[in-house]
Amino acid sequence: MVSIYVPLIYITILMGSMYGVSRFVRKSKNQESKPVSEEWFGENYSRNIFFSLLQQNPPAEDTLLKAALVLRATEGLRRLMKLKVSRMALNNLLNRGGVGDELIRKFGRLEKETELELMDIAKTANSLQPGWNQFIFQTCNEIIENEKIHSIIDNIPKDIDSISQRWQTEKILYEAADEELRIQAQKELGVL
């Protein structure tokens, strides 16, 4: 004899599993709607700053908008350079069968997002000052190269300390080996 609790338990389990599946599907759809660039690179603060300046009331000065746009374009170029390097590694992994279709699809979406971002930057630059879209990326590339040079220069004092310490230890080892060879040569000559 089947009690009244069996169908109730069955319905409860069925409803709970349906709720779990629907929640999982909604969660995965929400993740896909989020920009892929935020997953890979994190939040784009320079873009957020530019749009907040653009929507300010009263409007921000042109020079401030241009500076924010240069920062946004610089960040876009940095991301593009990272993508180019990552594309080579991804192709290598793809040839070996080390990555799945999901990653390839996300990477393709990321490249499209970055291209659209750079095209939007070029259009915005042209709207701020006609013809500026031709020069903004050259300026941003120079900024990136300048930052690389500054990071190398900033690391020189750290490198000097490590090189100096290494040289001191090598100098002591060299002097000890030289002293040992000198003593051995004197023994062979009969001086000692």
Swiss-Prot record:
It is a single-pass type II membrane protein. It holds the Pfam family Sec66. The keyword Protein transport applies. GO terms for biological process: post-translational protein targeting to membrane, translocation. InterPro entries: Sec66 (IPR018624). The chain crosses the membrane at residues 4-21. GO terms for cellular component: endoplasmic reticulum; Sec62/Sec63 complex. Component of the heterotetrameric Sec62/63complex composed of sec62, sec63, sec66 and sec72. The Sec62/63 complex associates with the Sec61 complex to form the Sec complex. PANTHER family: TRANSLOCATION PROTEIN SEC66. This is Translocation protein sec66.
